[in-house]
Swiss-Prot record:
Cellular component per GO, a single term: cytosolic large ribosomal subunit
Species of the source: Ignicoccus hospitalis (strain KIN4/I / DSM 18386 / JCM 14125)
HAMAP family referenced in this protein's UniProt entry, alphabetically: Ribosomal_eL14
Gene3D superfamilies, sorted: 2.30.30.30
Name recorded for this polypeptide: Large ribosomal subunit protein eL14
Family: Belongs to the eukaryotic ribosomal protein eL14 family.
Molecular function as annotated in GO: RNA binding; structural constituent of ribosome
GO BP field: ribosomal large subunit biogenesis; translation
Keywords: Ribonucleoprotein, Ribosomal protein
Length: 103
């Protein structure tokens, strides 16, 4: 099971969309992929993203390479992942050692 593949559901871990879930739509090269939320579902626009900024999940939707947002949204609904995709992931921030004594 390859981690980075078309249809794989991922969590964005860097940038202003951090914590939101997205679906890989296309593989651009060995460092970049095309992802979408889609925007109507959770606000993530279709865009190019570095794979280092994604955390792949164990879920996958059946879409073809380069599928448009309507087809991705339909595949998410068929897989029963609509509510799952809307939920945001809150990252656990590490506590710096200097603040550990105050907690």
């Amino acid at each position: 099971m390859p981690a980075i593949e078309v249809g794989r559901v991922c969590v964005i871990i860097a940038g202003r969309r951090a914590g939101k879930k997205c679906v890989i739509v296309d593989l651009i090269d060995d460092k970049f992929v095309l992802v979408t939320g889609p925007k109507e579902l959770n606000g993530v626009k279709r865009r190019r993203m570095n794979i280092k900024h994604l955390e792949p999940l164990d879920k996958k939707v059946e879409i073809e390479k380069g599928a448009d947002d309507a087809k991705v949204l339909e595949a998410i609904r068929q897989a029963g992942l609509e509510e799952f995709m809307k939920e945001e992931v809150k990252p656990e921030l590490p506590v710096p050692p200097s603040l550990g004594a105050y907690l």
